[in-house]
A protein has these predicted regions:
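Signature of N-terminal electron-transfer/Fe-S-associated modules in redox systems
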Residues: 1-161
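Acidic, glycine-rich active-site loops and adjacent beta-strand->loop/helix elements
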Residues: 66, 78-79, 234, 393-396, ...
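Flexible, low-hydrophobicity surface segments
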Residues: 151-331, 356, 444
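Extended active-site and interfacial segments that coordinate phosphate-rich ligands
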Residues: 179, 300-313, 394-396, 401, ...
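C-terminal catalytic domains of large/alpha subunits in multi-subunit enzymes
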Residues: 231-232, 251-254, 262-263, 408-413, ...
Length: 944
């Protein structure tokens, strides 16, 4: 093999490489510089950006041999003598990252941008030049701010450093940033074990086909191939199907059952398809080899004999009695057919209505696309029978339990470890087939097995989201009061009956935060020959809020009401709360009117007419929209925190959530700083390893901070109570004479005190202590919270459309979101920005396109799936409302999903408003230039 030599981060390196070795592979696999990430394999995402001879390049599209003799700088080499580069400092100071997976590429691209274009960069220039870099978390708002500040600092400007306290309510800069901005994070593909081998999946090219035979002989003879495993091996070894949990597990969520009393259809989802492939990308075999290249070569030689069958992909088509059946065991593709609400009361209300507004829509299928592709390493210890899985997910404990079920072994023999996780959004919320496969394969071959998903593979194998067909009606009286709503929702579960919770959690808030006395909906779930769907950010709520907000705008237009006044008339007032909506959900509290009024001011609704007139003079159409929302935050109700105060000056918190970009290492530490009075740098949050995390529901459904705050508070109070008794012994007084404040136990009326860490030392050193005071100063709180939380808010969006091109530009976006009590406003704002971007992305850009005849995914790469980029957005105007929730002991509401929930509705409301002069009543999502242009042309012809 040829030898390549180059200088990397100031060091001369050389190695023998295959001719097909890419620069990114050389950096990661030969030099172990894992800060350079691979996010797409097609040079579309920018995660792999490095500098070659001082110029930014995408290392996934450059051969290592092409860099022979070159000077290469990676993110690990950007800091000099331990001092952060100004651009790294700026990303930290301006919260320019969340999960951190795209961040090294962003920073390297930003430095290159400054080197090419100078230090005086405006936002428009930055957004345009950053179009080659993707971020799924941030919405780019803070990234652009960071690059502006970093560019100035590279020219010598002083970087502002935020100072102040580190307790609740402070915009503390994130602790985890320092490893992520320097390339020292540890994502799943960064994990490598001694003697590991590599897995590649053989996936079905058919949307629906019977598997007749699999020939593995040629693959087994391929150099480097160690094993080829099929469903026959899987079944012989006793592997079980994925233990799906189809419905939301929280007691507060509504229950859905088939109206005819039959069981809800549930199909076995094996990690390798044993009889039929039911969607393009379903794994049918696995090749294990010494190298990834050898495994890929072997996979090409696996011969699978298929008998193609008719496929069905469309949601409504799948519900028809004569549709091709995805599962032979079922009588139809409808696996759930439920009724919710009051049919009779709703019918009576419609009978007396002065106005009835109808709306039919399909909320298209999208995919979460975390920037980190999935990866997993499985290991097996034959001596102990212990399995270990290294993989990113939303929670280690749930993954461990599900993995043990699939492997058919006791949970005690399974360990799950996860480090940094590059985005979640619901896509990582459940176990995947490959996680069980690598653990099983490790036992079969006697060596650790690693699998890394390529992006094109992720598009067909990652769980997808949304895909809801809706028919809805809204009844109003002559004055515009809402009387009732009714309709039908059909959710597309994909090929497997994995999860109906988006359908369930959506329909339960179909009426949103409006006064709707009666409602009735039919809720159905169907299977189809498409990738399985799961909850995607805000699971089911963006779809139904979209429907409700479109109904209101349609009603205003059809019946002659003002859009804002119609909302004011029907929004619930604070005096009406708590309020039971027509589906049985109890909204605890909220200043719904106040939040909408704030959003209208923030979005400058009052002066919109002037901006519209100015746009018309330029031949453009300008529109504005408003949307109100409520979320139901439930999720797994149980969480536990174990808090230990160490005498050497550290507080450890063990908890079952996992940060996938939310900043738990910082915001959870702020809680401890507030309540125990210790410096934030002395608090360590420990998660993601089932060797020490024994209980926890993970991070989903807005449960992270909501439940963590409760159990950390309880544990902190226990520590203070225990510490008070210990301090009394140390100070030789009564516990009633002790007061705890700012990390110290002090005697009242005197100057004697002892610090928290000294008390912890005393607990370990004192003799003759009561039994309950002996040992470490520690406490544990294990709570099950059976009440839901209802974050809410109001968003205003303004768009400008070129009617000749159909192009839509979001020119303003304002959001007011109520979070009850904000722990870290900086982090929350970042969460809102990212949520908005994902919602706007669905409204204008994103869709999983399937060929209806074959089930082929036609949008299977970043070249085909239109992801939001930096130049798709303006800066966002965001504001937090803090009305304490009475159902949370600290008044908190979740904040991670609210940005997405109203975004679909507010954007399309603005688009339709912009096209009002053309008589356009609705534009389906995504409102692409072609779709908007066709709406303009069709209505221009109609109206002459």
């Amino acid at each position: 093999m040829p030898i390549v030599a180059m200088t990397v981060n100031g060091q001369s390196v050389s190695a023998e490489v295959e001719g097909r070795t890419l620069l990114v592979q050389f950096l990661r696999e030969f030099l172990h510089l894992t800060g350079t990430h691979v996010g797409c394999d097609t040079s579309q995402c920018g995660c792999c950006t490095v500098h070659v001879d001082g110029v930014g390049v995408k290392s996934c599209s450059l051969l290592a041999l092409a860099c022979d003799g070159a000077t290469v700088t990676t993110i690990e080499g950007l800091a000099v003598d331990g001092k952060l580069h100004p651009m790294q400092e700026a990303f930290h100071e301006y919260h320019g990252l969340q999960c951190g997976f795209c961040t090294p590429g962003m920073i390297m691209s930003a430095v290159d941008m400054v080197n090419r274009s100078g230090n005086d960069l405006d936002a428009q220039t930055i957004r345009a030049q950053l179009a080659g870099n993707l971020c799924r978390c941030t919405g780019y708002h803070n990234i652009v701010k960071a690059i502006q500040a970093g560019a100035a600092a590279m020219q010598g400007a002083e970087m502002p450093v935020t100072a102040g306290s580190s307790g609740i309510g402070e915009p503390v800069r994130r602790k985890e940033d320092l490893r992520l901005i320097t390339g020292k994070g540890c994502f799943s593909d960064d994990v490598n074990l001694p003697r590991q081998v590599y897995a590649v999946m053989v996936r079905s090219p058919h949307g629906h086909a019977r598997i007749l035979a699999i020939d593995i002989q040629h693959a087994l003879a391929s150099p480097g191939v160690l094993a080829v495993l099929t469903a026959r091996d899987m079944l012989a070894d006793g592997l079980r199907p994925i233990p799906h949990h189809p419905f939301a597990l929280h007691p507060a969520d509504i229950r859905m059952v088939n109206t005819d009393g039959t069981p809800v259809f549930a199909a076995p989802h094996y990690p390798l398809a044993p009889d039929k492939a039911r969607y393009v990308g379903e794994a049918v075999a696995m090749v294990i080899a010494d190298t990834v290249a050898a495994a890929k070569d072997g996979a090409e030689l696996v011969g699978v004999d298929y008998a193609a069958l008719p496929a069905v992909t469309n949601t409504i088509a799948a519900a028809q009695p004569d549709a091709p059946r995805v599962w032979d065991e079922a009588s139809s593709n409808v696996c759930l057919d439920a009724d919710v609400g009051d049919r009779d009361a709703t019918a009576a209300a419609f009978a007396r209505a002065a106005h009835i507004v109808k709306f039919e829509t399909w909320v298209q299928r999208v995919t979460g696309v975390p920037m980190e592709p999935r990866a997993a390493v499985g290991a097996y210890d034959a001596a102990t029978g212990q399995y270990t899985l290294y993989a990113g997910s939303s929670g280690a404990v749930r993954l461990k339990d599900d993995l043990a079920t699939m492997l058919n072994v006791p949970a005690a023999t399974v360990r799950v470890v996860m480090h940094d996780v590059g985005g979640h959004f619901g896509t990582r919320g459940m176990i995947y087939p490959e996680f069980a496969l690598v653990a099983w394969a490790a036992r079969r071959v006697g060596r650790p097995v690693k699998w890394t998903c390529e992006r094109i593979e992720a598009f067909v194998s990652d769980y997808q989201g949304r895909d809801l067909a809706v028919e809805a009606e809204l009844a109003l009286d002559a004055d515009g009061n809402f009387l009732a709503m009714r309709g039908s929702n059909i959710g597309n579960a994909g090929a497997h009956t994995g999860n109906f919770s988006p359908l369930q959690k959506g329909v339960e808030i179909m009426s949103s935060i409006y006064r709707v006395p009666a409602a009735h909906f039919r809720a159905r779930a169907v299977v189809s020959n498409t990738t399985p769907t799961r909850p995607y950010r805000s699971a089911g709520r963006p779809e139904v809020i979209f429907v409700m907000e479109r109904l209101i705008d349609l009603a205003a237009r059809q019946c002659g009401f003002d859009r804002v006044e119609l909302r004011r008339r029907n929004l619930l007032t604070e005096a009406e709360l708590p309020y039971t909506n027509p589906f049985g959900m109890i909204y605890d509290s909220g200043a719904y009117h106040e939040v909408m009024e704030k959003a209208l001011v923030l979005g400058d609704w009052a002066d919109f007419a002037e901006r519209r007139a100015e746009a018309r003079q330029r031949g453009k159409c300008r529109g504005i929209g408003v949307a109100n929302y409520v979320d139901t935050a439930t999720g797994v109700p149980r969480e536990r925190a174990e808090v230990t105060v160490h005498p050497e000056g550290r507080v450890d918190v063990i908890i079952g959530t996992v940060s996938t970009g939310q900043g738990h290492e910082t915001s959870f530490a702020q809680l401890v700083t507030e309540w125990l009075g210790v410096p934030i740098e002395n608090v360590r949050i420990r998660t993601g390893d089932t060797d020490f995390v024994k209980v926890g529901g993970g991070t989903h459904s807005g449960r992270g901070m909501r439940l963590a705050s409760i159990v950390i508070w309880n544990s902190s109070q226990q520590i203070i109570a225990k510490g008070t008794r210990l301090a009394a012994l140390l100070l030789r007084c009564e516990p009633s004479e002790i007061r705890f404040r700012d990390g110290r136990f002090a005697m009242t009326g005197g100057d004697r005190s002892v610090g928290l860490f000294d008390v912890a030392a005393g607990a370990m050193q004192l003799t003759d202590l009561p039994d309950d005071l002996r040992g470490p100063l520690a406490a544990c709180s294990d709570e099950t919270v059976n009440v839901a939380s209802f974050p809410y808010g109001s968003h205003v969006c303004e768009v400008e459309i070129d009617p000749e091109l159909g192009s839509v530009e979001v020119v303003r976006y304002a959001a007011v979101d109520d979070v009850g009590r904000a722990v870290n406003p900086l982090i929350i704002d970042g969460q809102v920005h990212g949520g908005i971007a994902q919602g706007v992305g669905q409204a204008l850009l994103e869709q999983c396109f399937y060929d209806s005849a074959t089930g082929q995914l036609l949008s299977g790469s970043f070249m085909d799936y239109s992801m939001p980029r930096a130049d798709n957005f303006p800066f966002f105007a965001t504001q937090l409302s803090e009305v304490p929730s009475p159902t949370h002991p600290l008044g908190m509401r979740p904040a991670g999903e609210g940005g997405t929930t109203p975004a679909l509705g507010v954007v399309i409301n603005a688009v339709v408003d912009a096209l009002a002069d053309y008589g356009v009543k609705h534009v389906e999502m995504p409102a692409t230039p072609e779709r908007v242009w066709r709406a303009v042309i069709a209505n221009a012809k109609r109206f002459g």
